[in-house]
Amino acid sequence: KVHATETTVEGTTVELNTNGHHATYEMKISGFDLDYKANKVYGVVLTTADGSEYGLHHVTNIWHGTKLGFNADDPYFASIIGKTITQITFYAADGVYVLPVNVAL
């Protein structure tokens, strides 16, 4: 259990690229001004419409704080393909940020 202030960040948008440079699925988040250099991101969780959760790892899945991605051939992410991401949760040094989104994969 994380003991931190949770903030819901409304109005964010996600640009999905399905043939990214680093990963098969890449997401760039806009409207979420997290200063990742001053406020370390410890982890990110993607939640889908059916309640499934997928944790992201630094370097492999998280770049520059708010750029996210994963490869379709990674067995861990195989079951997320075809689902809709409804929430992205950032665990950062100064709290937890919940971003309601609607990203169909």
Region roles according to the model:
Residues V96-L105:
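Edge beta-strands of extracellular beta-sandwich domains
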Residues G11-L46:
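Short, surface-exposed binding/anchoring microloops in extracellular/periplasmic proteins
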Residues E53-G65, A104:
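Solvent-exposed serine/threonine-rich low-complexity stretches and specific carbohydrate-binding patches
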Residues I62-P75:
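Aromatic sugar-binding surface patches on proteins
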Residues Y76-T84:
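Surface-exposed, short loops/turns at beta-strand junctions within beta-sandwich domains
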Residues V44, K83-A93:
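Short, aromatic- and glycine-rich surface loops/edge beta-strands on solvent-exposed regions
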